[in-house]
A protein has these predicted regions:
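Short S/T/G/P-rich N-terminal loop/turn motif that feeds into the first structured element of a domain
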Residues: 1-63, 79, 103-155
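Tryptophan-centric aromatic hotspots in well-structured domains and transmembrane helices
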Residues: 70-72
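An amphipathic, aromatic/His-enriched active-site/gating alpha helix that lines ligand/cofactor pockets
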Residues: 74-107
Length: 155
């Protein structure tokens, strides 16, 4: 069973970091041969990254149609994405070959955000270890850290 943290907490992370949002959209569900390989590729990549702390991958949250990833730097993210010996690059080239001219069958997207040290805030209450707090360190949201403004000013 997941442990719920009943008190208010926030995340604490040293230095800059990257938030990477990635997802897919099945536009033609009757064509699983187009979208199923895309769907199946991500869990393998996550397992691979979790086994390699030196990759710079800090953690992730999964939701339907969306995966939020936390990275130490953009350079770490890019190095993983372009490494032909890791799972992403072969999956990406296979995706492009498989789709060919039928790009509308399945959609993929991503957004990358560089976050400067101290330029973030978050709070969790009545939650399991989650989000940035799960990918970094969790601290009590007390004193200056009780409000969003206080958390941002504390950075």
């Amino acid at each position: 069973m997941v442990q719920i943290i009943a008190r208010r907490v926030t995340a604490s992370i040293e230095g800059d970091f990257v938030v990477f949002l990635i997802g897919m959209r099945i536009n033609k569900p009757w064509k699983p041969h187009k979208w199923l390989p895309v769907f199946m590729a991500m869990p393998k990549m996550i397992r691979e990254l979790e086994r390699r702390p030196e990759s710079g991958f800090l953690g992730h949250i999964a939701a339907p149609g969306l995966l939020v990833q936390y990275w130490r730097s953009f350079e770490h993210l890019e190095a993983y994405a372009r490494d032909p010996d890791q799972s992403h690059w072969p999956a990406w080239t296979d995706f492009n070959k498989r789709l060919g001219k039928s790009r509308g069958d399945v959609g993929i997207w991503h957004e990358t955000y560089r976050v400067r040290a101290g330029e973030y805030e978050c709070v969790y209450s009545g939650m399991p270890l989650y989000g940035l707090a799960r990918a970094s360190s969790m601290v009590e949201a007390v004193g200056q850290l009780e409000s969003a403004r206080g958390r941002l000013n504390a950075g």
